[in-house]
Every structure is written in C-alpha cells, then in structure tokens.
A protein has these predicted regions:
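Bacterial N-terminal signal peptides
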Residues: 7-17
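Sequence/structural signature of beta-propeller domains
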Residues: 23-433
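Intrinsic disorder/low-complexity segments enriched in polar/small residues
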Residues: 25, 30, 442, 458-461
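Extracellular glycan-recognition surfaces and repeat-rich motifs
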Residues: 445-464
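Serine residues within intrinsically disordered or low-complexity segments
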Residues: 19-21
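Extracellular carbohydrate-recognition regions
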Residues: 434-447
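Positively charged n-region of N-terminal signal peptides that target proteins for export
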Residues: 1-6, 70
Length: 464
C-alpha cells in the first residue's frame, strides 16, 4: 500500500503543474478576479472507499445503483475515529426508490480492485427524505409519469442546519416547469418545500426552467457569495440529454438563498435566483453541426452530475464532474440507427466513445456574468482534466454526485455502479498547495501528476 504521508513530503518540491490528461480550454487566460486559478496538480488523489454493500440480483437492496446525490455532514459520526476523515455523508440510495441515507467515511485506499475497498458503515438507513413531497409534486402534474422522477442533488447548509435537496422529472416530455427545491432537518425529518428556482415566465427558452436548475447542488464560498452574489450561496444546476424542453446544451449553474425568503419559504413560490452560466439550445447542435453549439465540444449524451467551488488560499476554481461524450451524436437503437455502443445498450441518445472529465471554470468570468458584462453562455472551462487513471471504469464510469469538506479540503466524488452489483465507489481528492512527484521510490522527478499512482499502470505520461 502506498505511503500517502511520504508522498505529501515529496510535495514540498515546487514544480509547475502539468498532466498529460489535462487540456487547456479555449478560454484559458490569467484570472482577472480576486484569485489565481487551480489546476489538476492542486488536487491530491487519496483513493476510494465503497458504499454500503448491495445484494445479488434480482433482489437489489436499498443501496444498489445509488450515489447520484451526495453531501458532506460535518456534524455526522461524532464518535468516529480520528483518522483524518471526520464527519459523514448523506447519499442517495437506489435510484428507483428515491431515498437517502447517511454513511460514515472510512479512510480511502488506492487500488484498481473495487473488492479491496473498505465499506462505509450505515449511520441512518435510507428513507424518503422529502417525506412524500416528491410524490405529491409529481401527482399534481397531469403530464408527468412518476416513474421518471428522481432525487436530484443534496447539500447540507450549515448556516440553517438543514439538508437541501432537489427533485426532477428526467424525461419531462411535456416540458413542465415544476417546483424542485426543498430542505429537511439534519436528522432527515421535517421536510419543507417544494419551491421553484427562479422566476417562471412559462415561455421557452426560459433561463430558470427546471430543466436547467433541478439536479446537482453545492455551495459557493461565503466571502465570494457575500461580495458578488448578494449572499446567494446555494448553487444548483442540471444538464438533461440534448438540452431540449427547457434544458441547456452544456452544464449550468444558478445561485440562490432560500433561507432569506422564509423559514421555510411558502410552498410553491418562485425563489429569487440568478444565473451564473447556462448554454442556449440549437437543433443544429444536436445534428452534429457543432459550430452552432455554445459549449465547446458539446454532445447530447454528456452527463454532468455534481460540482464543487474550491477556495484554497489565494487560488479558486469551480469544478464540475461527469462523463463526456466524444463521438458524433445519435438517437435510436444501437446497431440500428446508431453504432453499437460500449456503454449504454438501450434506445436513446448516444455519443460514443466517452471519458470521465472534470471541468475547471474561472470564477472571475462568473463575476462578469453576474455584473452583466458577459452573457451567461459566453463562458468555457479554462481547463479540462480526465481522471481516467483514478476511476474504476475509464470508458463508461459515471462520475456523479460530489461532496466537499471545505474545512479539510476533502472532495468526495461518487462513481456510480463501480462494483459488480451496482455498488457505488466514493473517490477522494484533497486540495493541496503544492505538487508531488510520481511517488515511486526511484525519486524520478521527470513525472508529475495530480494523482497518487498505484503502480506503473497508474503512472501519468511525462509532460512535454
């Protein structure tokens, strides 16, 4: 097993960050904002642990095929060991059941074998965190099929000691613009909601349609939110396939502060929110005429599942995690209208091949959008990093929900269905101020990386 402490010691040698799997975005430039920009070299990969165990099919238990929503609870697991990973995680269970539970955080390990991972323990069993509000919202929609409704995102709000959550209709063929946000006490009781994120003009295109706002949740740094966002610290976003029916052809981000509109706000209201970025919809973009796309490299089957806004000393960045399509867009049955895919065998949108990606956005450009000097769709990641060596499935592994222990700089990222029976893996990165060498005893300083390698097969290519 690798000695992480020794790797951190090597990190005291300062070398400019570089990675063969990181590419500079077309909009990359020096930050005009209050900070410098983070790079993949500022993220130290610590390994992974496994979610609670699932049973063999067809009797999947509550935890199989979950992990699509995640948030850090700093007050969780108070009697846990002092192992450097305090707190706990609220995490979505089986996606078909729309439930959430709470697990502890065991120390991660670096391995290519999922079965070697330490299992998280269950602190609170899975329940309907919305206490029936998801079902009630769906039933009130005449064109909705409740089988298509999902738990979207989770975010613990320390300032009000509540767990915020989103719900949404992933199919939504009627483009219904329904309420999507609520919150629950930390003990997973007393659900309140549901509220709409932003104003509803009910005309498409709509900057606040729930097809853009109702999935992942995370928070902006408090000082940034106070200075630039009018104290709107809670962030949300959603990228649905193809971006149609109120969606965005690219990832989105919105800011709000529902606690300023009531404790709790009145059910059904339109919350005050502002767009930080989204991308317009063009039919030509779905038809492989990519010059029409606002988001560079957009594909209809891109999947962005979570994010984190990092502030580390004088460095800052907004990171979004997901699975990125690299091939042409196609809709239909594999082997009929579309080529036979490696990842999704069913009828629908395809953009094979795929790779896991982390998008790095510049907060200074978000400031320009909020202040009105830049359009919300006139923004690109300044850097894209593919953690293909860190994930268990570098071709089809879905990096989904993200949680952040801001005090300790620990990022938790779910890789869905990483285990044989749909078990979730939780990858852990730590934000560090310095870089480290490849971690091998040879002391070879020609190779540098933002990951902890697990052996020769984990080694990054040398920088050019």
């Amino acid at each position: 097993m690798l000695n992480v402490a020794r790797l951190l010691l090597v990190a005291s040698i300062l070398i400019p960050p570089m990675s063969s799997s990181a590419t500079e975005g077309p909009a990359a430039k020096a930050s005009k904002g209050p900070t410098t920009l983070l790079s993949p070299g500022d993220l130290l990969y610590l390994g992974a642990f496994a979610g609670p165990e699932s049973v063999i099919p067809p009797d999947y238990d509550e935890w199989a095929y979950g992990g699509h929503a995640l948030t850090f609870n700093p007050e969780g697991d108070p009697s846990g060991p002092a192992d450097g990973f305090p707190g706990a995680l609220f995490i979505a269970g089986n996606a078909q059941q729309d439930t959430v539970g709470e697990i502890n955080i065991p120390p991660p390990i670096v391995t290519d074998d999922f079965n070697e991972l330490t299992r998280a323990g269950i602190l609170q069993p899975v329940i309907d965190l919305t206490d029936g509000l998801l079902t009630a919202t769906c039933v009130a929609c005449s064109t909705c099929d409740c089988d298509n409704w999902d738990m979207g995102g989770l975010q613990y709000l320390e300032n009000i000691d509540r767990v915020a959550w989103t719900i949404y209709d992933w199919y939504n063929a009627g483009a219904e613009d329904l309420e999507s946000l609520g919150w629950t006490d930390r003990d997973m009781s007393s659900a309140s909601g549901v509220w709409h994120i932003g104003q509803r003009p009910n005309d498409l295109p709509d900057p606040f349609h729930n097809g853009k706002t109702s999935d992942y949740l995370f928070t902006a740094p408090a000082t940034f939110a106070t200075q630039y966002l009018g104290n709107r610290r809670l962030l949300s976003g959603y990228h649905r396939e193809s971006g149609a029916l109120g969606g965005s052809q690219g990832p989105t981000l919105y800011a709000m502060a529902p606690w300023l509109e009531g404790n709790p706000p009145v059910p059904g209201i339109d919350l005050d929110a502002i767009p930080l970025f989204f991308y317009r919809w063009f039919i030509e973009c779905t038809d492989n005429q990519f010059d029409f796309c606002d988001f560079d490299g957009y594909r209809v089957d891109d999947q962005w599942g979570g994010g984190v806004w990092i502030d580390a000393g004088d460095a800052m960045a907004i990171l979004l995690f997901g699975l990125k399509g690299l091939g042409d867009n196609c809709y239909g049955d594999p082997g009929v209208e579309c080529p036979t895919p490696a990842c999704e065998p069913g009828r629908g949108y395809h953009s094979d091949p795929y790779e896991p990606q982390i998008l790095f956005y510049d907060p200074s450009q978000v400031i320009e959008i909020v202040q009105g000097s830049r359009d919300p769709w006139d923004i690109q990641p300044y850097l894209v990093y593919s953690p293909e060596l860190e994930v268990f499935d570098p071709d089809c592994g879905v990096l989904s929900a993200v949680a952040f222990d801001r005090e300790h700089g620990l990022i938790y990222v779910a890789e869905q269905a990483a285990g044989e029976w749909g078990d979730t893996a939780i990858h852990v990165w730590q934000v560090v101020a310095t870089l480290f060498a490849d971690g091998f005893e040879s002391g070879n300083l020609d190779r540098w990386s933002g990951v902890v390698p697990g052996g020769a097969e984990k080694q990054k290519a040398p920088c050019n």
